[in-house]
Amino acid sequence: MGDTRAFYRRRVPEVLFDVRWPDGSTQSFYSPSLIVEDYFRAGANYPVAEFVDTSRVCMRIADQRVRQKYGFGCAQSVATMAGIEQAAARFASTDEVTLEAFRR
């Protein structure tokens, strides 16, 4: 199929969202849908557990939207969720993560 990132960039309303973890480290994550802007607010703090749970909902919806539109799921949303879960595992569920910004 070729470069799937290029495919999504041309056809899917994608967004990057930047987070600051409780230890001060920052990380950017990809969503193949703008759904994250409906569930999160830039500049807001979230307990790690809530951030992970809400991200899971967003990535599931994003995957469904890609599947409905193109007939296949989105590997990028699965990879995003894996990255979020891996990073979040370093912190207590009640620690705060900040969603710093959305980038289109």
Regions found by a protein language model. Give the residues of each.
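Motif-centric detector for short Cys/His coordination patterns
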Residues: 2-104
